[in-house]
Amino acid sequence: AGIGVLGVAKTMMTEIFGTTLPKTVNANFAASYVLMISLFNMGGRFFWASVSDYIGRKTTFTIFFVCGITLYLSIPYTAQQVSVSPSIVWLIYFYSATMVIFTMYGGGFATIPAYLADLFGTRFVGGIHGRLLTAWSTAGVLGPLAITSLRERSLQRSIEQMAKQVNPADFAAHFGAPVDQIQTLVLQKTVTLSKLMEIAPRGIVDPASTLYNSTMELMACLLGV
């Protein structure tokens, strides 16, 4: 599941925390986040491969699935909390959780050949592993597309919900068109979430931090399958 997140990791970090913790999460921070993903991914290959020699391959993959599902499901809660009560604590948790996820992603790559040998014997490892790598490559292409699609749906839903809470007169004055034309305005990039927040009533929480919640839930489901 982690491979689908790799291509959009920088964007995720910026959109989840950029609006709530702008002094901390900027372009340089997001770029360093991607660098750390690579380092933890590489380190996970050595760490989990070594650990699997002691606890067994099956136990190692059980840890991957259980911890992965738990961490993915905890991220939407983190995003929700940082949007309501911005705190660097939530950023630290998100950062740590995703780094653990990517160590397990790297560890999966490193330990899967040995696990396949344990299950099917060394004679069949080559063919099975080749098919598995093909599936991994496919996920690398389709994963970011699926994540982007889910994010766009969440964005559209958030814009529509927020538009309903904005005074129609304020909306028309700000965007030069009535609220019933919102679909056209969104396609033209005239209406965006940040622009809606400018005229939103007090107390409305910016939903930008939660746009990837459905994505994280999908990642957890994929691990469960």
Where are these regions (language model features)?
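Extracytoplasmic gate region of multi-pass secondary transporters
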Residues: 1-49, 109, 113-116, 140-155
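Juxtamembrane helix-start elements in MFS-like secondary transporters
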Residues: 21-37, 61, 90, 94, ...
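Transmembrane alpha-helical cores of Major Facilitator Superfamily
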Residues: 32-39, 66, 99, 103, ...
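Cytoplasmic membrane-interface "Motif A"-like loop-to-helix N-cap segments
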Residues: 53-66
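C-terminal ends and interior cores of transmembrane alpha-helices
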Residues: 66-86
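Hydrophobic core of transmembrane alpha-helices in multi-pass small-molecule transporters
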Residues: 86-107
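Paired intracellular helix-loop junctions of major facilitator superfamily
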Residues: 115-126
